[in-house]
Amino acid sequence: MPSESFLKKIMGRDLQIMENDADMGPEYGDHADEPEIIADFTEYSPFHIGHRHCMMEAKRRVPEGLFVAVIPGPLERNGRGLPYMMTREARAAIAIRAGADIAVEGPPMGVMGSGQYSLCLAGMFRALDADWIPRGYRPIPGFEEVLRRINLGHRVVPRPHRIVDLDKGETLLKGPLEEDNYVITSLARALGKLGFDFRGKFIFVERIGGVSGTEIRRAVSDGDLQRVAGMLPPETMDVLSEEIEAGRAPLHDMRLEDEIIRNASEPGMDELMDLNLFDEVTASALIRGRPYMTLREVEEAIPPSFSRHHRQRILSVLEAKVHKGLVHKYIENYPSVIRILGFKDKQILKEFKDRIPHRRLEIWQ
């Protein structure tokens, strides 16, 4: 099990990265038109056979393309606000070994709302000048029409308990969406907001069965990797074993509990309201619930919200004490730098640098 000091070091470093990135603006310049860029946002927590299936299908359809894996991100918390199993460096290493050409850093999803991180991802696709965007989806009745409208370039957006085509003024689907499908519509909305023409750019790949991220994480927590070996490619098994041996994994059961308890217990109303994702209801509830002795007490004091991930995201915001102003500035300039977490070889790296319009690139050290 990694030490608390290891996690504290990551948090401190990543908060500084966010602050530095927020203070810079992106730079754009001339670029080559080829090869085509396949930009895939996937959290890889961990990379399983479903992820490999989506990657291989995209590479099959665009055999000469450069496959760029966009891997979140600073603070190492996922879109649901939960800790990742491995650092983004390790997740990038798996992606490259499994077939990606380039891996770049995505946004700090765990301390953002879905609308915020979707804007960041859309900004990254624009900065990469993405030709293709592969996305896995789960088939449900009526969703094929949603996908068709998106690939026509329509502004298809998620609303509470329904999906709406704004261009046609039609409700396409009613009821809550499964997470993978929700991300597709949220991303399409964000791309439209930024004026990115996504007509015909999505490669929609039906998810394969027999894979459970929850089961994988539970098996890793139990120290029984072999129980889920059929769900994981050998590249994931190898890197995960290396990370565990080095004391850098698993991270998905770890929180900086003392920081969360302190930041839930001490700040006044104004200071809490300055934290990202906090509203008056959440801040007031945390103040009423004091004092706190355990992480569970803090979690139970956080009121429910429209998003079922609200509690975990709030815990992640408290953990790193992430302020609204920082996040807003970060989103405004994102990506101020394309941070390269891994690459296949030097020739691929040169092709990538020549191809994308963003001129400020940094290789992760």
From Swiss-Prot:
It comes from the Archaea. InterPro entries: HIGH_NTase1_ass, Rossmann-like_a/b/a_fold, tRNA(Met)_cyd_acetate_ligase. It holds the Pfam family HIGH_NTase1_ass. Belongs to the TmcAL family. This is Uncharacterized protein MTH_1126. It comes from Methanothermobacter thermautotrophicus (strain ATCC 29096 / DSM 1053 / JCM 10044 / NBRC 100330 / Delta H) (Methanobacterium thermoautotrophicum).
